């Protein structure tokens, strides 16, 4: 296997909290998939959840080599967790098409957060 894309993003959680305080749920509705939205509404720490999802979606867009533009949207990336809690990245729409065009056969994602920051790294392999 060869790495064909790598993206990392770090988010200051207080920044996301400020956006949520100013604009309510608009950011969450814009970046989360339907499944993630349901999880966000039930989450014990919704701002932290949102910050981690924002970071992973930015990291994934960077791994694809584009960022969020040229037809890519935040809701085309979705994070689910396996039975052990490991994050799994799913791609839809233009994001999935671009990954296929690049020849990606495997996606790896890791998320981490501390008191002030959330970060994510995404690797695409073929």
UniProtKB/Swiss-Prot annotation:
One GO cellular component term noted in the UniProt record for this chain: cytoplasm
Catalytic activity field: apo-[ACP] + CoA = holo-[ACP] + adenosine 3',5'-bisphosphate + H(+)
Pfam family, one: ACPS
Alphabetical UniProt keywords: Cytoplasm, Fatty acid biosynthesis, Fatty acid metabolism, Lipid biosynthesis, Lipid metabolism, Magnesium, Metal-binding, Transferase
Listed GO biological process terms: fatty acid biosynthetic process
Family designation: Belongs to the P-Pant transferase superfamily. AcpS family.
The organism's taxonomic lineage, starting at the top: Bacteria, Pseudomonadati, Pseudomonadota, Gammaproteobacteria, Enterobacterales
Keyword Lipid metabolism: yes
Positions of Mg(2+) binding: 9, 58
Co-factor(s): Mg(2+)
Intracellular or extracellular location(s): Cytoplasm
A single GO molecular function term of this UniProt record: magnesium ion binding
Functional description taken from the UniProt entry: Transfers the 4'-phosphopantetheine moiety from coenzyme A to a Ser of acyl-carrier-protein.
InterPro entries on file: 4-PPantetheinyl_Trfase_dom, 4-PPantetheinyl_Trfase_dom_sf, ACPS, Ppantetheine-prot_Trfase_dom
Entry's EC annotation: 2.7.8.7
Protein name: Holo-[acyl-carrier-protein] synthase
């Amino acid at each position: 296997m060869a790495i064909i894309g790598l993206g990392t993003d770090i988010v200051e959680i207080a920044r996301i909290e400020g956006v949520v305080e100013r604009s309510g749920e608009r950011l969450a509705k814009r970046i989360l998939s339907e499944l993630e939205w349901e999880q966000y509404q039930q989450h014990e720490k919704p701002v932290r959840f949102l910050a981690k999802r924002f970071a992973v979606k930015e990291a994934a867009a960077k791994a694809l080599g584009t960022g969020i533009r040229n037809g890519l949207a935040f809701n085309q990336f979705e994070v689910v967790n396996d039975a052990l809690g490991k994050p799994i990245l799913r791609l839809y729409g233009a994001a999935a098409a671009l990954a296929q065009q690049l020849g990606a056969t495997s996606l790896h994602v890791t998320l981490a957060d501390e008191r002030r920051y959330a970060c994510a790294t995404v690797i695409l392999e073929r």
